[in-house]
């Protein structure tokens, strides 16, 4: 409960006992440094979570596996090296006309990091999305509405699982830099 209390205090600027942070390590780093990295993580459980001496250093899944992956929206993710982060190299909505026929996925895949801004750039490509933001064509609002409605559906699906005795914090990761 102390971690939750510190998070609430930090969000409300009420002087938490610690600044709440978490550290994520790429699978490639675990694969390379193995037990040495596990020793570092064990030394700092407040940053890395509980000690895990049974870690499978070679277990890599999803878009961390080298190759091309297509997500529920039709974005093509490319990864050159297993364990590293992949990047979107194929944007399924390259033109404004394509926005007019875009349908959100029927499949519910949750709320990945890149909840709104990154999803928009994944769909359109960074340059095209920046032009859309600058010019504000009608297709921009159409795209925003499609992604927003999908995200609302994902959050609605998640809410029943958050009801319980312990207070929960829900956050949505995104990135503009």
Model-derived regions: residue spans:
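Catalytic cores of TIM-barrel enzymes
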Residues: 1-177
């Amino acid at each position: 409960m102390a971690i939750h209390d510190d998070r609430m205090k930090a969000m409300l600027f009420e002087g938490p006992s610690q600044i709440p942070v978490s550290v994520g390590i790429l699978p490639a780093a675990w694969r390379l440094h193995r037990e040495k990295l596990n020793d570092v993580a064990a030394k700092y459980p407040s940053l890395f979570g509980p000690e895990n001496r049974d870690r499978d250093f070679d277990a890599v899944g999803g878009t961390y596996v080298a190759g091309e992956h297509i997500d529920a929206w039709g974005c093509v993710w490319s990864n050159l090296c297993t364990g590293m982060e992949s990047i979107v190299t194929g944007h399924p909505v390259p033109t404004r006309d394509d926005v007019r026929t875009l349908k959100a996925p029927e499949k519910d895949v949750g709320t990945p990091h890149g909840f709104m801004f990154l999803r928009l750039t994944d769909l359109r490509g960074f340059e095209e999305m920046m032009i859309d933001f600058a010019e504000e064509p009608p297709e921009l609002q159409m795209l925003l509405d499609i992604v927003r409605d999908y995200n609302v559906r994902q959050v609605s699906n998640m809410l029943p699982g958050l009801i319980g005795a312990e207070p929960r914090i829900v956050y949505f990761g995104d990135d503009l830099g």
